[in-house]
Amino acid sequence: MAAQPLLRILCLAGFRQSERGFREKTGALRKALRGRAELVCLSGPHPVVDAAGSEGARPDSGPCPPEEQPQGWWFSEQEADVFLALEEPTACRGLEEALETVAQALNKLGPFDGILGFSQGAALAALVCALGQGGDPRFPLPRFVILVSGFCPRGLGLMEPIMQGPLSLPSLHVFGDTDGVIPSQESMQLCSRFDGAVTLTHSGGHFIPAAAPQRQAYLKFLDQFAD
């Protein structure tokens, strides 16, 4: 019997995560989905200069390799390299470059069956799906999307494509009851914009869970896309 082909999933990192750091953060998930899915990690296009103490930051002040440089998808202030998910931004600086980065990855690294996003990456993934459903040729709709600690992006019309109408692709929304960065109600609001959304809650905080109970939920969700 031939082996089941792997589902290919483009994974969008959170804010202040380096490419290497995000690969490490998704290591448990990659192990949980071994033999079922291939995870291709992508970090944002913008270096986050003031990232001391953040995910992926080095303890010294010396230069770090590109794969270890903390990155972001866009910033919520015009001058500062910051992102505040729960506040109305004064700008969405760098967003178009973020969208172009995803478009290039889809074109050059694809095809992909699904998209997974974490935190800011989940907000971007939702926006990409909304733009694709609205006819943006850069973003053909994936077969599914997995949004971990997601939220509706704020500012400069970002929320409108998501709020205009229900998104009609299968979605799994993963969030923690004690997430102090993205409160669960933010993830639930995003979840409400998808038809037939599936939720996976856990008792933890701001991370991608991959223990046995979550593994079964991921596999059950992905089973419907097995060829």
Curated annotation (Swiss-Prot):
One of its GO terms (molecular function) is hydrolase activity. The keyword Hydrolase applies. The active site is at residues 119, 179, 206. Its EC number is 3.1.1.1. It catalyses: a carboxylic ester + H2O = an alcohol + a carboxylate + H(+). It is an enzyme of class 3 (hydrolase). Gene3D superfamilies: alpha/beta hydrolase. GO terms for cellular component: cytoplasm; nucleus. InterPro entries: AB_hydrolase_fold (IPR029058), FSH-like_dom (IPR005645), LovG (IPR050593). Keywords: Hydrolase, Serine esterase. Pfam families: FSH1. SUPFAM superfamilies: alpha/beta-Hydrolases. Exhibits ester hydrolase activity with a strong preference for long-chain alkyl ester substrates and high selectivity against a variety of short, branched, and substituted esters. Is able to hydrolyze ester bonds within a wide range of p-nitrophenyl derivatives (C2-C14) in vitro, with a strong preference toward substrates of >8 carbons. PANTHER family: ESTERASE OVCA2. Belongs to the LovG family. This is Esterase OVCA2.
